[in-house]
């Protein structure tokens, strides 16, 4: 078999060199790749014959590639077709590093069956795998106020109310398709000039809601902390402001010594559980952005675990509103 595993499209793992420098896979160990995707991080780590990878991915298309990895790397590679919030069920506890790449690959974006892009026609989908409902269900079944919350908080869409009102009005005539939703958004924003496509924020909101990305990330990070031993790393690459806000709070809040104040609610932790590996976020170099334009919005954060016993009630409470909005999806299951 060739030294590299062929992929359908040229794949560039984002910030690969920077991640490899941090986690030092030249020294033997076991690593957890929570978003296997097209295998870029895993393959690089497995270049060291003493390294092992356990990989997770919810996308059914990742299974085929994982079989190629199993043939090439044999017992050094193990794959689970699961969401990364389920890493808590792993028996292995000695990971050197746990890696989360929260972006979407080119293959996923241009997969018409997934319906992630507003450039395709047909039925709304946006399911990444192991989902209970689709974007079609969301747009055609939820109430106006529920849609407003999704667009406003998950897409940071300032026209959430107008868009939701038009959705309710138009769906009374027929089930709405991707083209219908794009048309509604364009009509709502016809007098605006945008650097990004007018549909970007609304489609982001639906994708986050359909795939329950907030709860996946919140509990994925908590479970990652519980899995790794002292002096091991959690590495996260984010691509939009909402997920980066969650990761930033997780990293910074638990890497500071805190004192209770009579003016503020009592905190559950007063000592550091993490050490910030990079004090400032790491972003792609101009060369990487030129080679791989979608990487331009990537932000890398890394922490090292230095203490057991963290209580994450404060973390969950911080994003309670977003988690409650996600729970609206239960009525579609």
Task: Set out the residue ranges of the language-model regions.
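S-adenosyl-L-methionine-dependent methyltransferase catalytic core, i.e., the SAM/SAH-binding region
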Residues: 1-333
């Amino acid at each position: 078999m060739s030294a590299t595993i062929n992929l359908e499209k040229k794949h560039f793992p984002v910030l690969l060199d920077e991640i490899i420098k941090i986690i030092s896979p030249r020294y033997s160990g076991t690593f957890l790749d929570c978003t296997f995707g097209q295998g870029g991080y895993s393959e690089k780590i497995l270049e060291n014959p003493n390294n092992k990878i356990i990989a997770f991915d919810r996308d059914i298309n990742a299974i085929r590639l994982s079989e190629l990895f199993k043939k090439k790397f044999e017992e050094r590679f193990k794959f689970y077709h699961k969401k990364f919030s389920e890493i808590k069920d792993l028996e292995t506890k000695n990971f050197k590093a746990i890696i989360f790449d929260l972006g979407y690959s080119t293959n996923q974006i241009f997969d018409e069956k997934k319906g992630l892009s507003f450039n395709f026609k047909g039925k709304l989908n946006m399911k990444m795998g192991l989902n209970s409902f689709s974007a079609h269900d969301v747009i055609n079944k939820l109430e106006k106020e529920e849609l407003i919350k999704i667009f406003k908080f998950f897409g940071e869409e300032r026209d959430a109310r107008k868009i939701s009102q038009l959705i309710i009005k138009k769906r009374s005539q027929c089930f709405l398709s991707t083209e219908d939703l794009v048309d509604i958004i364009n009509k709502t924003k016809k007098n605006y000039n945008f650097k990004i496509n007018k549909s970007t924020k609304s489609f982001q909101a639906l994708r986050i809601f359909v795939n329950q990305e907030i709860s996946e990330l919140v509990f994925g990070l908590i479970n990652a902390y519980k899995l790794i031993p002292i002096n091991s790393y959690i590495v996260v690459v984010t691509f939009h402001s909402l997920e980066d806000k969650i990761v930033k709070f997780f990293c910074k809040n638990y890497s500071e010594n805190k004192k209770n104040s009579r003016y503020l609610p009592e905190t559950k932790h007063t000592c550091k559980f993490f050490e910030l590996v990079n004090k400032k976020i790491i972003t792609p170099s101009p060369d990487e952005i030129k080679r791989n334009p979608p990487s331009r919005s990537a932000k890398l954060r890394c922490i090292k675990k230095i203490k057991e016993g963290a209580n994450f009630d404060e973390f969950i409470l911080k994003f309670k509103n977003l988690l409650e909005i996600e729970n609206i999806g239960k009525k579609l299951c």
